[in-house]
Amino acid sequence: MQTPEQKLKQLNKTIETLWHGVSDTKDGDYPRIVNLYKEVLKINYKDRDAWENMIWLMWSLAVNNKDTSWLFEAEKYVKRYLSLLPNGYRSHEYIGQFYRTMYIDERLAVRHYESAIRYPDATPSTYHSLIALCIKIGDKVKARDYCVLALRRFKNDSYSLMRLKQLDAR
């Protein structure tokens, strides 16, 4: 009988072999890897890397196989990820990225990026994504406000300075 730690080690080694142990990652057995990540999460639901890798693989399967059922499955797991790990910028930032790039819903992406920047460990790139999204959806007032907010937190942030100058020039 394996301990949970031994089982996790075995699962992660198998994932590594199936995903990265092939000459081209496109040759990996993504559905099997997704199932292995589900097993990892049964043992340790706090493994943010497992959540994010599994969701990315589901999105990749949807794109590569032109099968939207994988995308719907990915969204289901995105919501579960947030419900189990709601605290911390990383969950919200990743989900903002999911809705920005994978399951396109820019307004929902903005909401999650806004949640992410409330945490003290939010990175400049989170602000950059939020600013770019606000500009893209035409909310220049919010974009400007987030530039100012980013500059308060990250003095001399070149991206925020550049965007602020562009927004003020309009």
Question: Residue locations for each model-derived region?
Answer:
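N-terminal leader/linker segments that initiate helical-solenoid repeat arrays
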Residues: M1-L36
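Residue-level recognition of tetratricopeptide repeat
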Residues: D47, G88, A122-T123, N156-D157
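Structural marker of alpha-solenoid helical repeat scaffolds
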Residues: I43, L84-L85, R118-Y119, R152-F154
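Terminal, low-structured helical/coil segments at or just beyond the last alpha-helical repeat
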Residues: M1-Q2, L11, P124, K136-R170
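Alpha-solenoid helical repeat scaffolds
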Residues: E52-N53, R90-Y94, P124-A132, D145, ...
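Structural signature of tandem alpha-helical TPR/SEL1-like repeats
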Residues: G28-N35, N64-K79, M102-S115, I137-Y146
